[in-house]
């Protein structure tokens, strides 16, 4: 019987993958045969996670700060330089604020919106040619946007 979750031959990018939900998603993809790129702005955590996940398959770490447009474009460029096709994009990077609602500064709001909204839009549009190239009529490529309240705890 073939493995229902076999995704061999596919390539994925998981952002915010140094820990938590992102690391768990990357683990599942690797165990299903996917070459998986992981990214995070926290370099030490990212490469530690890469080392752990490499036991499951080909895991490549790229350090990137997606809170800026330049960081998004830089990550997309590195992916496009390495992979002509991207079958799966998991937009998981995110942040929350560290202030009470009534004291919340505009700079904090901008940071949250840049990472949680703008970065996933621009990363998707930057990688769209690679995503379209991976898609077929029988097997479309996937973009998954993740939201969580993990940062609130």
Q: Which positions does each model-derived feature cover?
A:
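Conserved NAD(P)H cofactor-binding loop of Rossmann-fold oxidoreductase domains
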Residues: 92-97
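Conserved glycine-rich cofactor-binding loop
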Residues: 11, 18-20
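A short, exposed helix-loop element centered on a Lys and neighboring polar residues
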Residues: 124-125
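Residue(s) in the substrate-gating loop at a strand-loop-helix junction
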Residues: 148
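Substrate-binding pocket helix/loop in short-chain dehydrogenase/reductase
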Residues: 100-101, 105-110
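Conserved glycine-rich Rossmann-like NAD(P)H-binding loop of the short-chain dehydrogenase/reductase
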Residues: 32-48
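The beta1-alpha1 cofactor-binding region of Rossmann-like NAD(H)/NADP(H)-dependent oxidoreductases
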Residues: 44, 63-74, 106
């Amino acid at each position: 019987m073939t493995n229902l979750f076999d995704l061999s031959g596919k390539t994925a990018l998981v952002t915010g993958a140094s820990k938590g939900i992102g690391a768990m998603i990357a683990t599942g993809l690797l165990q299903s045969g996917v070459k998986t790129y992981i990214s995070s702005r926290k370099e030490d955590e990212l490469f530690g996670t890469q080392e752990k996940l490499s036991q499951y398959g080909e895991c490549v770490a790229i350090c990137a700060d997606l809170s800026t447009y330049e960081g998004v474009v830089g990550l997309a460029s590195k992916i496009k330089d390495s992979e002509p096709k991207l079958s799966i994009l998991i937009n998981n990077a995110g942040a929350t604020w560290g202030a009470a609602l009534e004291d919340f500064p505009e700079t904090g709001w901008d940071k949250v919106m840049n990472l949680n909204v703008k970065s996933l839009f621009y990363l998707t549009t930057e990688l769209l040619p690679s995503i379209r190239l991976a898609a077929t009529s029988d097997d479309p490529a996937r973009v998954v946007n993740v939201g969580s309240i993990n940062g609130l705890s």
